[in-house]
């Protein structure tokens, strides 16, 4: 089998030949990752400055996203009051984002060097994580939207359905469902020599003219279109319900909480869709054989890919601004960390002062020579 699709998204949306200019490729050609894209008119590699810019963006997203998502998971695990059904889903989203952020240094190195230097095992791992993240993120956001729908439109039933234990079970089911794609692409993925360069690719079964487009369309439908449609239906029903009723729960305080959490989930979903729509469309187009025809198009596609990963570091920021409980826990964590540093500095100063005082006292008691 000849490799058709480069597996992770930073590779899926591009294709090129080392010994020619960019062109339209039929789906049965070998597609190479973005760092091997050639200048359409000069047959040269894209500028080093562009590579460095994208790699720098990847590293910034990696560091900021890891700090934010790890803090989100810590807060949910640390505080009992944070273990609500919605926050259990948020934990799952943060976990998926953390895993994919850990792959960005490898992806950045791949782009900068122009080849995959990390071997076959890590190639399979990065491929699997990339696809797991795509499916677990969309499935988790769908579950959060359905959870919000039940809370708003069926408040009595929600008392039995919306529990943290059931949310945990849904999270397990989400990862199991994502394995339907994650495991096969990991098996098909491998580090191969393509045009004298080592590339991390996924081998699509033959006939590739058939399975290539099928693969691309299925990924587009089940990882994006279907979840977004379900989410849209849920929020349409919720908006109609919210407009038709002044009080949802009989309590103004509970009602404010319901609306606040619903707004948070809606914003998280909207940001996700905004960040991932461009790259999803380009993935579908590439799977159908359409390739970028200029260096500018290549640059745009690369930044669209980076935008998808930027989404992974935005969620903790949204929680901090839109959810009072997360904001309070984040503030408590930061204040506690600052207090611990102050205490450590104070203890160190006192220790030094004691040592100096003891040294001075010792020098005073030592008899001077006659």
Swiss-Prot record:
Post-translational note: Phosphorylation at Ser-363 requires GRK3.
Topological domain ranges for the Cytoplasmic compartment: 75-87, 147-165, 237-264, 323-370
UniProt feature coiled coil, ranges: none
Induction: By phytohemagglutinin (PHA).
Location(s) in or outside the cell: Cell membrane; Cytoplasmic vesicle
Extracellular side of membrane: 1-48, 110-124, 189-211, 286-300
Effect of residue 346 to A: No effect on ligand-mediated internalization
GO cellular component: cytoplasmic vesicle; neuron projection; plasma membrane; synaptic membrane
Disulphide-bridged cysteine pairs: 123-200
Bilayer topology annotation: Multi-pass membrane protein
Modified residues (Phosphoserine): 363
Spans traversing the lipid bilayer: 49-74, 88-109, 125-146, 166-188, 212-236, 265-285, 301-322
Function: G-protein coupled opioid receptor that functions as a receptor for the endogenous neuropeptide nociceptin. Ligand binding causes a conformation change that triggers signaling via guanine nucleotide-binding proteins (G proteins) and modulates the activity of down-stream effectors. Signaling via G proteins mediates inhibition of adenylate cyclase activity and calcium channel activity. Arrestins modulate signaling via G proteins and mediate the activation of alternative signaling pathways that lead to the activation of MAP kinases.
Protein name: Nociceptin receptor
Gene that this sequence comes from: OPRL1
